[in-house]
Regions:
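Conserved beta-strand-loop surface patch within small alpha/beta domains used
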Residues: 1-81, 88-171
Length: 171
């Protein structure tokens, strides 16, 4: 993993975005969100990772403070997961994030934002709920309101899940 990070950092510094997006897509496919976030911080730009219905990964670079949900042509819906970064701050749902999630309610299943404090997730509910939602009414009433999962806790869960998978395979 260290080699992948160093290679990605060299590509970012060299301005070779196409090569960088391929590396980020691979890291995202492996669930290595901490590395994806560090690359975004190093580049000083937000980035967006979108998993489509066929589990194809699409990566899009934004600016220092904005990367809206912007699916490329030919992508398969529904979108399984949209992950984007806030490289200069915390994981929270900005107004742009909320607008993107609201607009994607019918075609997006889950969204996450990566920030310095951890990972914030939301999952679309089949029906609006009165418990823990992003808004009281409208499209955001169909999205769960969750707490930020600190990076340390995320790492522990990831390690725990890896150990469980190894145990299941070896039994």
């Amino acid at each position: 993993m260290k080699d992948e990070v160093n290679t990605a950092l060299e590509l970012i510094e060299g301005g070779k975005a196409d090569d960088t997006t391929a590396i980020i897509a691979e890291l995202a496919s492996r669930g290595q969100w901490e590395v994806v976030y560090l690359l975004s911080v190093t580049a000083g730009r937000e980035l967006s990772v979108l998993f489509d219905a066929e589990n194809t990964v699409h990566v899009d670079w934004g600016g220092p403070g904005l990367v809206p949900l912007h699916p490329p042509l030919g992508i398969s819906i529904p979108f399984r997961l949209w992950v984007h970064t806030h490289p200069h701050g915390y994981a929270y749902w900005s107004q742009t994030d909320r607008q993107s999630i609201a607009q994607g309610t019918m075609i997006l299943e889950q969204a996450q934002v990566l920030g310095g404090n951890g990972i914030l997730s939301t999952t679309r509910l089949e029906h609006p709920s009165s418990l823990g939602r992003l808004a009281d009414s409208g499209p955001l009433a169909r999205w769960t309101k969750e707490q930020v999962l600190p990076w340390e806790e995320w790492q522990l869960r990831k390690q725990s899940n890896s150990c469980e998978a190894i145990t299941e395979v070896s039994v």
